[in-house]
Structures are given as C-alpha cells and as structure tokens.
Amino acid sequence: MSKILVFGHQNPDTDAIGAAISFAYLQKELGKETEAVALGTPSEETQYALDYFNIEAPRVVTEAASETNQVMLVDHNEFQQSISDIAEVNILAVVDHHRIANFETADPLYYRAEPVGCTSTIIYKMFKENNVTIPAQIAGMMVSAIISDTLLFKSPTCTQEDIDAAHALADIAEINLEGYGLDLLKAGTNLSDKSAEVLLDLDAKSFPMNGKTVRVAQVNTVDLAEVLDRQAELEAAMAAENAANNYDLFVLIITNILDSDSELLAIGAEQAKIEAAFNVTLVNNRAFLPGVVSRKKQVVPQLTEVFN
C-alpha cells in the first residue's frame, strides 16, 4: 500500500495545516502510513504556532498522483479548493466542518463533517474515541487551529464543543489560552510588508454559485485603516485576478479581530449581488459589515442565496 498524503485546502490557514498534522498523526497511530503535507506555505500566524511548538512545517505539494494514489482531506471537500489532480487519486477520508459541494468519489470513503467551528475540534474527538494520547506539540497545533478558526471564540461558528476542546488541548499543551491566543492572532495581522497580490491570496477560496465563480478572500487586522489606505492597489489586483481567472466577483473581507467587525471590498461584474446579499449600499466599492467575522457562516451562504 502506498503512503497516504493528508492535506488541507489551498492557501492553507492554521486549521488546514494543524488538522493535517494531527489527523496524519492519529492515522499513523492507528496503523496507516501517512504524511501530512500542505498545498501552500504557512501564513505568519501558522508559522508562529509551528515555531512555538517546535514543529516543522509540512512539505508543500502541488500534485499527488506522481507519488501516491491515496489521499485524505481535512478542512475542505470542494475540488476547486483541493490539490490540482484530486480527480486522479482515491480519497480515503474527509474530515471537515464546511458545506459539501462539488465533491464526488468513485469509491466509498470515511466522511465526517460536523457543524463546529474548526476541523481540529472534530479530530480532538476522534483521538478520544480511539483512545489515542495527544502529544503536547500536536495539542498545541490543534488548539492554535481552534483559536484561529473561531477568532478566540468570537466567531458565530464557535460552539461549546470548540471551547471545551480548546481548553482541554491548552492544558495538554501547557499554554495560557487567552494570552497565547491573542499573541497567535496578532501574529497574523502583520500586513504592511505584503503586496496586494499576496494579501488577496493569504486566505482565499473560490465558490461556484449558479454558473458564476465568486472568489472570497479574508484578511485579519487590528487596524482597518491600514488596509483600506491601500484600496486602489487592492482593487487593481482584484480586477487583475478576475480577468486572469474568469471570476465574476471578487470579495475581500477585512476583519478587525479586536472589534469583530469587517469592511467589505467588492470588484466584478456581479457586484450588485453584494447589496442584495447584505442589505447594504456599496459606496466606492465598499460596505461596513458590523459583527461579521465568518466567511463560512456570514458571507458565503448569503451570497449563495442571492446568486440562486
């Protein structure tokens, strides 16, 4: 049997990388030959966690079929968010907390999706169900993923299960949850030295919506003005992305992690859908979205509804 590659989505966030590391470890403990890999380099936030817990970043891969015919997916299922040759390999398992879309397999598989705030919360439960001890380093990456995905429990996606798992994992990792959590989130807000193109690609996903393609990117900051001062540069980069990739709409969500509010910037032919989705009026391609922090729960469903 060939080695099984375990990976999260393109433009990986802390959960995509942390869940790959923890799920690969769990599967190895259960007797499978696995390797955690990534579909991109770690963000500064993720690298902070990797460095803190002294874990080497997973190997970056762009395709799988040349080295294996077996993969396991974490933190995603939609093919357009996955590895380039996903249709050429056998998907053995999926562990995810997102909607199911653009996904099919030729063979039966293990599929576990739960409406929680973070994939690592589900994997924590799987460790317990299988009576596998979680090493401190692995626990550190898992709690980092939960902190990241739930914005330290401020996101509407956060559930009591996420909170309970985070506290248990923090104890194993021997960290102060609040103090470490704030440091982790702030590590991901250093945006000033990044080009517009890099900013737009830090955490971006494409979504097919009734024959249209919508790209939704999100960046976290502690200073909205710092990002919005670069609006013209960002708009030019968004327009270029639309032209290069045939996106019908590019949406950038700029989230203030301290206030739990976001500013939306939208460019594209389907821009009018924004006003209907969020009951706002775009002014200079922008709208303020109070209380919006979650792409998964507060942006994508609303856009999907108006496109349908």
Curated annotation (Swiss-Prot):
Amino acids binding Mn(2+) 2: 15, 75, 97, 149
Reactions catalysed, semicolon-separated, are: diphosphate + H2O = 2 phosphate + H(+)
List the Gene3D superfamilies hit by this protein, alphabetically.
DHHA2 domain (3.10.310.20), inorganic pyrophosphatase (n-terminal core) (3.90.1640.10)
Which Enzyme Commission number(s) are on file for it?
A: 3.6.1.1
Spell out the InterPro entries in the cross-references: DDH_dom, DHH_sf, DHHA2, DHHA2_dom_sf, Mn-dep_inorganic_PyrPase, Oligoribo/pAp-PDE_c-di-AMP_PDE
Q: How is the cofactor bound?
A: Binds 2 manganese ions per subunit.
Its Gene Ontology cellular component terms are: cytoplasm
Q: Which Pfam families match?
A: DHH, DHHA2
Q: Which UniProt keywords apply?
A: Cytoplasm, Hydrolase, Manganese, Metal-binding
Where, subcellularly, is it found? Cytoplasm
Q: Identify the domain of life.
A: Bacteria
Q: Which cofactor does it need?
A: Mn(2+)
Q: Which residues form a coiled coil?
A: none
Q: Which family does it belong to?
A: Belongs to the PPase class C family.
Q: What is this protein called?
A: Probable manganese-dependent inorganic pyrophosphatase
The species this protein belongs to is Enterococcus faecalis (strain ATCC 700802 / V583)
Lineage runs:
Bacteria, Bacillati, Bacillota, Bacilli, Lactobacillales
